[in-house]
Amino acid sequence: MVHTAHQDTDLAAELRADVRRVSTLLGESLVRQHGPELLQLVEQVRLLTKESKEAARGGADATGPWSAHDVVAQVRELLASLPLDQATDLVRAFAFYFHLSNAAEQVHRVRGLRTRQEKDGWLAKAVSEIAGQAGPQVLQDVINGLDVRPIFTAHPTEASRRSVLDKVRKLSDVLAEPTAEGTSARRRQDQQLAEIIDQMWQTDELRQVRPTPVDEARNAIYYLNSILTDAMPEMLTDLSELLAEHGVTLPAAAAPLKFGSWIGGDRDGNPNVTAAVTKEILQLQNQNAVRISIALIDELISVLSNSTALFGADQELLDSITADLKNLPGLDKRILELNAQEPYRLKLTCIKAKLINTGRRISASTYHEPGRDYATTPELLAEFGLLEASLRNHSAGLVADGALARVRRAIAAFGLHLATLDIREHADYHHDAVGQLVDRLGTEKAYGELTREERFTFLGAELASRRPLSGHPIKLEGTADGTYDVFRSIRQALHTYGPDVVETYIISMTRGADDVLAAAVLAREAGLIDLFSGKPHAKIGFAPLLETVEELRASAEIVDQLLSDPSYRELVRLRGDIQEVMLGYSDSNKESGVMTSQWEIHKTQRKLRDVAAKHGVRVRLFHGRGGSVGRGGGPTYDAIMAQPNGVLEGEIKFTEQGEVISDKYSLPELARENLELSLAAVMQGSALHRTPRTSDDERERYANVMETISDAAFARYRTLIDDPQLPAYFLASTPVEQLGSLNIGSRPSKRPDSGAGLGGLRAIPWVFGWTQSRQIVPGWFGVGSGLKAAREAGDTDQLLEMMDRWHFFRSVISNVEMTLAKTDMEIAGHYVSSLVPEELHRLFHMIRDEYELTVAEIERLTGEMELLDAQPTLKRSLEIRDQYLDPISYLQVELLRRVREEQLSGGEIDERLQRAMLITVNGVAAGLRNTG
């Protein structure tokens, strides 16, 4: 990327100025709302905590004569003396600083994007590299098969309310407008910013009730509306122009980027997602898709004023208008008269009318009327083909490639359904439903008594049979009926919205091939699959979700067994010879640590690639990544480029969760940048990484070193996880028990029937708790032991070579380094000394020792004196953030201490205390830009 140091310096200066500006405005707001005393208290606490950090780190920059212990004692004494209302205002002030500085940072990122030359973007770089290294034909092949799918999930990691996020976005919009200091424009802008900050201060940042899945769907739609109408069409237009320079075309109806959603389809562990809820959310998505389409059509109507009095139009287009007018007798006669010689406007008016009718039909659950509404997205897109052909044939090719193509590509991406809905359910629920159906037949052996192999054989034979297990609708017992009902709901949804509304059914906790066949048999019962009739069909596909290390290691055997079954192989053929497999990053990390999880997932991708090739199918990998490194997070571009060779064939799916969505997609420019990154990485990986970047010898040597690292890291991690006192330590040293009160998401934080302990705790609250207490164990623990083991085995030179030559290894180490930089053992020690019983302190010593070892090993590997030396701007940013983050952590400890004292006394916890405690949780999340 061509980007000068001078530009970076200017941008950094602008960012610092913006942060100072909004901080000053926040201070003025605090004085307006509460008088000068609150602002004075904020500064007193900030300076004290800053001094304690400096003293703890050696005192080189300390400004006072006190030891770290003395300063911490002062902070504790001050905070313990604060009345509850004052403590609440104090923590809100620090939390609001992060909301405002985060907004300033987003504006800074947007400015950085705008300073780049037009030809210096990620897509321009990808197109140029592919055309230059592989040739235009390879580039065309990649474009033809490009299918990138970000999947929005409702995973509860966004701690901020939409009401707050909306105001933050509004503040970002105002801040982004350039004004000169001392001008009237700057004064007006400051007035606007001050007004927004006052509004934010008087807005409750905590949710009073837990959101429903429908609420979560509305939140996702909020972001999708902007992405699908602004960021994506413009980006695809630019991509089309870049490709044209190399003689490559982006087909007019192509949809290289499509969004999906789990919201309303993810049933695993969420009893609130019922068939009725799924139906309601699909209808909500359709209403928004129709509304967006109509708005886009209105834009085209205003543009396409081409007149037949000056230029002609294709007869096929004119004939279609005649047919439309016959089918739509209720159109406004005045519009028809005004546009009598403007066929494109007439056609678009008819398309708009049919879209309105489509929305009404779906809302009323009535039947499709051919010619009056649309049954499928392809039917709608075919109308644009008529418009395009006529424009090209009558000297308006630029219009066809411009305004028309922009709208056509947008509608091709979201269709009548807005986002494709994945359905996910736990494997055990399918076996329960199948078992009830089978046992009604009076078989010799009860279904529940069958081994996995026996179940696979039985289910394979059942899938091959045309005889259903039940010839008529029946009601099953318990949760089985709800499971069975979902498949019937999918069939109805496909009939109502078309084949793109639901494409994939995900089986979580897949441990064997029989788990996938059980879901397929239920789909067959619901009429979604018919493999051997005169018109065979498979209306949905099935994706095993591999979540634990054991499942990842068995991945090749599971998929090989599946594809070896003739009936299932026929099902995959009917789905275009694509087998989707989802890889779960969160649970494998929680179970085995970050290094082993990442390595096992990397190896799994290689194995799945080879199994798919053996059976003549393509594997589409679905990466279930969270926002934090402890749940597979990290830069998207690096993650995609770090995949093994031959894995990418233009197709990929990945989850976008919680706070990641607001961070990546809240501003149109940021949304575009993230979409560009994803598309560019998939294009480059598909075209230029078909063969290994390293030799056979290198790959073998690197793999051997990784096994050494992984084994040692895993052993060290399990030493901590298997410690019988860890659950007590985790609950004592973190605010994880307060997570449920935050009302972040509709899904419970523990798996149903999971009992006590950490085993049933989901990965999100697991990472959440460690992050809040600044220990962030899931993002690095064990890595130091792993690297040390490799070094002591004589692999130091190999490690340095791997950093230089192997994208995967370099990406993992980079993510671990970032997490270590956000980890703070001084603050974590304050949590432990204040909240954790003495007999559990040994666990903190174990964590701190591994932290120090990991930092030392990372610095040895990178050649840095300190973490992030190679990224000084980021390093400085985190140091500045600590000045405002540390006070929130100290306040959290104090408030958590008060909460627990009230719990021990048996009294009811003061609602104001609980509220203040939860605000600290929001504040730490905003400060670290991570929850779980």
From Swiss-Prot:
The active site is at H155, K590. SUPFAM superfamilies: Phosphoenolpyruvate/pyruvate domain. Keywords: Carbon dioxide fixation, Lyase, Magnesium. GO terms for cellular component: cytosol. PROSITE patterns: PEPCASE_1. Belongs to the PEPCase type 1 family. This is Phosphoenolpyruvate carboxylase. It comes from Paenarthrobacter aurescens (strain TC1). The gene is ppc.
